[in-house]
A protein has these predicted regions:
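C-terminal and inter-domain tail/linker signature
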Residues: 1-245
């Protein structure tokens, strides 16, 4: 049995052209690019379990929509609040064959400490462990450079869900010849939208966020971080709570 986790060097960067009418609306002919992270388990070179996050918010923004507006339109297109497809939550999770939690590695442990501290509101850890010239690649096709921009992303996200429960479901770190130390974590944040931040004014909607984060470390700290979650799925949960059709 072998386990494969896609690290930052394997992070999928996709390009596409919106040529046909479908789930992203009427064809626009626009060329877009977006990131995908997949946490995969394989046996005999065949993937039999996978967790995947696609930057859907980044896709729709390039097509001219906000994540909030697209989620609202998606509910309408799917028949309204009572009939639409529900966003993914833990209750819908189908248990697959992979039961592992990752490996025991100092880089995975360090990245877990960093993320846990950030979600707990201890943003000073960014100054402590990130490279001053470090970059963060975030949902909605955003890039942040250095402490202040990275901190702004995380605090806006954290402030929207201040009492939500952060859980690490999978943690792995690696050191390989000719590669920098790196780590990958699959996590969830579950709780009420009871703060003003990334998702606007508080609504008290109960929200489930599935995220995956990758880190690449250099001699001066964490130099490249990749975090993805689906903004549209989060906004859809908020709209459904509010009964918006």
């Amino acid at each position: 049995m072998s386990f494969k986790f896609c690290f930052p060097i394997d992070l999928v960067f996709s390009t596409a052209t919106h040529l046909e009418t479908g789930s992203f609306g009427k064809a626009t002919g626009k060329r877009i690019s977006y990131r995908v992270i997949a946490d995969c388990h394989a046996i005999n070179n065949q993937i039999n379990d996978e967790w995947l996050v696609r930057d859907a918010g980044g896709i729709v923004q390039q097509l001219g929509f906000s994540s909030a507006d697209f989620a609202h339109q998606q509910i309408r297109n799917e028949g309204g609040v009572n009939s639409c497809i529900r966003p993914f939550t833990a209750s819908q999770d189908v248990k697959g064959p992979y039961k592992g939690k990752g490996n025991d590695n100092e880089w995975g442990d360090l990245f877990a400490e960093i993320l846990t501290s950030i979600i707990s509101g201890k943003s000073d850890i960014i100054h402590q462990y990130y490279d001053r010239a470090g970059k963060g690649y975030y949902p909605e096709n955003k890039m942040a450079v250095s402490f202040s921009e990275i901190e702004a992303f995380w605090m806006s996200f954290r402030n929207a869900l201040p009492s939500a429960v952060f859980t690490i479901h999978h943690k792995i770190g690696r050191e390989d010849p000719f590669f920098p130390p790196r780590a990958a974590i699959r996590w969830s944040l579950v709780g009420k939208h009871e703060g003003h931040g990334r998702f606007g004014q508080q609504t008290n909607a109960y929200v489930h966020v599935m995220g995956i984060s990758h880190a690449e470390f250099g001699p001066w700290g964490l130099r490249n971080e990749y975090t993805l979650f689906d903004d549209i799925a989060i906004w859809k949960q908020i709209h459904l709570h509010e009964g918006r059709e």
